């Protein structure tokens, strides 16, 4: 995976519309989300490559050390519409679903525990170089595709079950209210 540091900008660069700056708040659980609180900057302030669908967005620094290292695959953004912010890293790889799934495993949790500086009120910080220098066992490209596809399907099934549960809870709440 190739990682890149995020955009730093001045308050005067912020606009109501423009290029969206992806931040830690765009990672909800393990999903990519766009929100009303997203920040936009004037295009002239952008001096890095834009984020693309299937890039991996990683929180590199945060006031809460437990949020450092959270990650997700970027989906559903138009070309040239967003960049990652200064406290974020962006990973690009041929097999994003495999790499993102591997970042949910024990090696990554241990890596975060060992390498994230912070605590006692300090801002948690994940070094790009520390992440780049991690050595992990990587299966062949074909195996990565199969494993990545499996986890993508699993994520999809989990999402479907969460939606079903949410809808059922609404139905049961309505039934309960009608019974009363």
Each PLM stretch: what is its role?
Residues 1-180:
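Feature detects amphipathic, helix-rich regulatory segments
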């Amino acid at each position: 995976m190739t990682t890149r540091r995020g955009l730093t900008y001045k308050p005067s660069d912020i606009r109501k519309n423009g290029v969206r700056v992806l931040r830690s708040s765009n990672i909800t659980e393990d999903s990519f989300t766009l929100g009303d609180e997203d920040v936009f900057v004037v295009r002239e302030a952008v001096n890095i490559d834009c984020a693309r669908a299937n890039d991996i967005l990683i929180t590199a620094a945060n006031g809460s050390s437990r949020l450092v290292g959270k990650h997700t695959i970027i989906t559903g953004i138009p070309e040239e519409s967003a960049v990652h912010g200064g406290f974020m890293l962006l990973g690009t790889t041929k097999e994003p679903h495999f790499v993102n799934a591997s970042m949910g495993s024990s090696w990554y949790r241990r890596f975060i525990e060992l390498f994230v500086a912070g605590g006692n009120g300090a801002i948690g910080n994940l070094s790009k170089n520390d992440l780049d220098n991690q050595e992990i066992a990587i299966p062949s490209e074909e195996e990565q595709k199969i494993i990545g596809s499996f986890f993508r399907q699993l994520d999809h099934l989990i999402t479907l079950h969460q939606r079903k549960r949410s809808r059922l809870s609404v139905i049961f709440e309505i039934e309960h209210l009608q019974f009363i």
